[in-house]
């Protein structure tokens, strides 16, 4: 998994460099999470396989991190090199924020924050009781940013989901504590997150969002339990993770990856 996350980060840098698009810091912070989700958690047959209709569902609610999603899909064989090289370009099919029509593996069009969890709750309700070819209940997994936890729609869905006994719904919050204009905890503090989610009836755990073994153990323990509660993992992460001069720096929410920056960043990843 660690090698996969490293390769995904390299792809993210390449995509950002070619397209000269922002949000590199946000994409790097969730590379480990996405590597785990696609490598170990999701049941995701290819779109031309019979059981694709019984796939698990993943929603990227923090859609400005689309580069990380595209890089992950490419690494695990769900997207072609041609597709990701056409990201954010004339004639390309992959936009800067996710578009459901761009790929069968993109489950939701997004951009405006706070919608991933409400949509995930509806999807989880609609597939309750449905099993895949492995005989397992289909899952819905959603990745959110910590800044979007400030959205009221998130808390409406958070209150509603436990009442529906959606144990096959899993939320991962990329808590890098940096959003568009500063520290999320200072602009509109959302703490104590654990107590809030737990009070609404979720199984809630705080984990290192760069420790894939820890995250996997938490998810597998939940899946094997008899709980009726949905799961939320508060994943403590570092914006720009893996590239020292980008780490924990607000400006890399916006800065572009020039050729010089790209080569220097690759050296750090090596």
Predicted regions and their residues:
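N-terminal capping segment at the start of a domain
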Residues: 5-21, 174-176
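Cofactor-binding active-site loop characterized by glycine-rich and histidine/acidic residues
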Residues: 15, 22, 27-163
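Glycine-rich beta-alpha junction loops
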Residues: 32, 64-65, 176-177, 211, ...
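Generic beta-sheet signal
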Residues: 56-58, 138-142, 169, 227-237
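Short acidic, glycine/serine/threonine-rich loops at helix termini
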Residues: 71, 99, 153-155, 181-185, ...
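Conserved thiamine diphosphate
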Residues: 136-138, 186-218
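A short alpha/beta connector and helix-capping loop motif
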Residues: 151-176, 232-234
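Glycine/aspartate-rich loop-and-adjacent alpha/beta segment that forms the canonical ThDP
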Residues: 212, 217-270
């Amino acid at each position: 998994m660690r090698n996969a996350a490293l390769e995904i980060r390299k792809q993210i840098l390449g995509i950002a460099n070619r397209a000269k698009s922002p949000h590199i810091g946000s994409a790097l912070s969730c590379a480990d999470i996405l590597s785990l989700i696609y490598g170990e958690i999701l049941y995701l047959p290819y779109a031309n396989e019979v059981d694709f209709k019984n796939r698990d569902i993943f929603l990227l609610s923090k859609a400005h991190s689309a580069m990380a999603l595209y890089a992950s899909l490419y690494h695990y064989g769900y997207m072609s090199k041609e597709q990701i090289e056409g990201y954010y370009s004339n004639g390309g099919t992959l936009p800067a924020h996710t578009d459901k029509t761009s790929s069968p593996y993109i489950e939701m069009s997004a951009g405006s924050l706070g919608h991933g969890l409400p949509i995930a709750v509806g999807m989880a309700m609609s597939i309750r009781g449905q099993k895949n070819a492995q005989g397992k209940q289909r899952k819905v997994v959603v990745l959110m940013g910590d800044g979007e936890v400030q959205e009221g729609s998130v808390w409406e869905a958070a209150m509603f989901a436990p009442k529906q006994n959606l144990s096959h719904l899993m939320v991962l919050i990329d808590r890098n504590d940096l959003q568009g204009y500063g520290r999320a905890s200072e602009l509109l503090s959302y703490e104590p997150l654990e107590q809030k989610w737990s009070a609404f009836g979720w199984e809630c755990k705080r984990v290192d969002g760069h420790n894939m073994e820890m995250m996997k153990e938490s998810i597998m323990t939940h899946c094997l339990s008899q709980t009726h509660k949905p799961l939320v993992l508060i994943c403590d992460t570092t914006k720009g993770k893996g590239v020292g001069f980008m780490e924990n720096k607000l400006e890399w929410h916006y800065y572009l990856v020039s050729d010089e920056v790209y080569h220097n960043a690759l050296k750090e990843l090596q």
